[in-house]
């Protein structure tokens, strides 16, 4: 999809961002989505080709997705996400099935599951993956495009949950988790959904990574912020690539 800022448009969306950052570590990655038979779709293919990014983008009879992005004074984004677009209608294809059966890790979110078509495809893809593959649920709550059912079903399928400090409070309220601290809520989710790991990002404070046996906290480096759009995908892609390359939890986190 295209993130449309006041100053112009940029390719966005968690699949592209995650796949790009995983590829920076020398791993084979592939962005999976759908685009329209339109100029915006053509431009996405051209951009992906220019950047050497592998993709499986199905052409469908819906417009290519766009998101209107505005930044507040702290460069934190708010989104107006167009509905009824191509990525709401990702079809399951033989090529996608073959990709799933050869996949070591997948990162999926809640937003693309707002439509029945894409939700069915995402869940079918996950179910076709090898038993020992990693399933990362990067929750990415946006506006009203999530339900308790989508969140719970996704966490049940996942090995790793990636969530931020705002989202974890929403999930805790949704699931009637009474623990107050972010860390304790993470522990509840670990146990309740039999997760291997929870990654909790806390903006400019830092980030937690928790398993049943260990935990790690790393402060966020002090930097000049231009925009936080895609920051979570960058973090997740880099962390997961490090884990796949055999680094320890602490090494991957740092």
Name each model-derived stretch:
Residues 22, 164, 232:
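Short, conserved phosphate/pyrophosphate- and ester-handling motifs at nucleotide-, phospho-/glycolipid
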Residues 175, 179-254:
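Conserved phosphate-binding/catalytic region of the ribokinase-like
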Residues 17-28, 241-246:
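Alpha-helix C-terminal capping segments
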Residues 1-6:
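Positively charged, low-complexity intrinsically disordered leader regions
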Residues 105, 109-188, 205-207:
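Conserved beta-alpha-beta core of the PfkB/ribokinase-like small-molecule kinase fold
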């Amino acid at each position: 999809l295209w993130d449309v800022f006041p100053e112009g448009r940029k390719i966005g969306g968690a699949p592209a961002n995650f796949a790009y950052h995983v590829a920076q570590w020398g791993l084979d990655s592939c962005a999976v989505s759908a685009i329209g038979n339109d100029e915006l779709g053509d431009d996405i293919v051209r951009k992906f080709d220019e950047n050497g990014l592998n993709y499986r983008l199905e052409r469908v009879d819906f417009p290519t997705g766009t998101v209107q992005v505005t930044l507040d004074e702290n460069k934190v984004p708010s989104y107006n996400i167009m509905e009824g677009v191509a990525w709401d209608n990702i079809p399951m294809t033989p090529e996608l099935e073959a990709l799933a059966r050869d996949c070591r890790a997948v990162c999926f979110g809640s937003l693309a599951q707002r439509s029945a078509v894409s939700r069915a495809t995402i869940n079918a893809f996950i179910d076709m993956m090898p038993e020992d593959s990693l399933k990362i649920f990067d929750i990415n709550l946006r506006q009203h495009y999530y339900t308790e059912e989508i969140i719970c079903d996704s966490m049940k399928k996942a090995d790793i949950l990636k969530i931020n400090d705002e989202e974890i409070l929403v999930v805790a309220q949704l699931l009637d988790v009474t623990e107050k601290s972010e860390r304790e809520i993470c522990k509840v989710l670990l146990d309740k959904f039999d997760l291997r790991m929870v990654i909790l990002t806390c903006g400019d404070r830092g980030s937690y990574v928790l398993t049943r046996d260990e935990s790690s906290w790393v402060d966020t480096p002090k930097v000049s912020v231009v925009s936080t759009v895609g920051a979570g995908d960058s973090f997740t892609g880099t962390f997961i690539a490090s884990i796949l390359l055999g680094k320890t939890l602490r090494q991957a986190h740092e």
